[in-house]
């Protein structure tokens, strides 16, 4: 019986994990790396980890405790970075662990985890840098554009020409183009794009140096109709998972027994019940959960 329950719990945990990574893909607006290119060389691997930390630093992620930062990569990313970091001077104990379990350990202050559920993002048909803004001085989460020359999919990352990100404390330009994520599919010929975060050039929540100019070019991360794996690095405050204890049914109307267990904030309810009509003894497991991107600016996608 315990083996059956463990198998069912594993299936549920996998689905929670998959939904969490998909939530991260759709809500994270920072993205670096070259989609389709794995960091298989030493130079590319170092650039990947350094670039991730740079973007998190620019976004104001805490630096005092680097154990707050994690990186979740798919199997190909794990394998390529293991290959790319061969020959670097490292703590012998870390190298021993890598050799023993085939998993990269803690590269450049990032707590690493391999996950087969890392999401695959597919861009729409819009050509990378041919669409433009229609009208200067725009702000907010909906940007008016000239009729799109193709589709743009939800989760796609974009930039606007000459619109840089700012340090969240000093409001000084980081020198890096501000990135945004498209929050709803946009059809071919559409004249607006929904984005996150809201474009805010002034005030307490300023996140860009300026609004895009009229006819500013919109550049899409990746290529038209291209797909990439959305490996994700994040500070521990970027995302949250909530699980809620559920109602315990009375032992009647077929319910034989119930149990609910919580550990580290994870709650599972097990219900055992009998179907008298069909003479079948059943057992089900339930979880009630939800993911949220609390501070998505403290996350970055590394596309491969």
Located regions from the model:
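Autoprocessing Asn-cyclization modules and mimics
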Residues: 79-198, 202, 301-302
């Amino acid at each position: 019986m315990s083996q059956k329950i463990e198998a069912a719990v594993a299936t549920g945990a996998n689905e929670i994990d998959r939904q969490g990574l998909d939530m991260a893909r759709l809500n994270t607006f920072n993205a670096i790396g070259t989609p389709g290119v794995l960091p298989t060389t030493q130079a590319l691997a170092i650039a990947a980890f350094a670039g991730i930390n740079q973007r998190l630093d620019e976004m104001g992620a805490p630096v005092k405790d680097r154990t707050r930062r994690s990186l979740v990569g798919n199997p190909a990313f794990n394998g390529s970075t293991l290959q790319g970091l061969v020959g670097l001077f490292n703590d012998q104990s870390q190298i021993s662990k890598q050799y023993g379990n085939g998993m990269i350990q803690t590269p450049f202050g990032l707590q690493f985890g391999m996950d087969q559920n890392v999401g695959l993002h597919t861009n729409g048909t819009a050509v990378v840098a041919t669409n433009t803004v229609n009208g200067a001085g725009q702000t907010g989460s909906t940007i008016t554009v000239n009729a799109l020359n193709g589709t743009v999919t939800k989760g796609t990352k974009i930039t606007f020409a000459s619109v840089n990100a700012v340090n969240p404390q000093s409001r000084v330009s980081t020198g890096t183009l501000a990135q945004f994520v498209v929050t709803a599919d946009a059809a071919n010929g559409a004249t607006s794009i929904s984005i996150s975060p809201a474009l805010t050039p002034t005030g307490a929540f300023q996140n860009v140096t300026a609004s895009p100019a009229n006819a500013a070019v919109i550049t899409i991360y990746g290529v038209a109709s291209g797909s990439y794996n959305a490996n994700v690095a994040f500070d521990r405050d970027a995302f949250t998972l909530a699980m809620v204890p559920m109602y315990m049914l009375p032992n009647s109307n077929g319910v034989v027994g119930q149990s609910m267990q919580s550990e580290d904030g994870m709650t599972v309810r097990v219900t055992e019940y009998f179907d008298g009509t069909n003479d079948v003894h059943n057992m089900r497991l339930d979880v009630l959960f939800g993911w949220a991107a609390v501070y998505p600016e403290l996350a970055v996608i590394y596309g491969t």
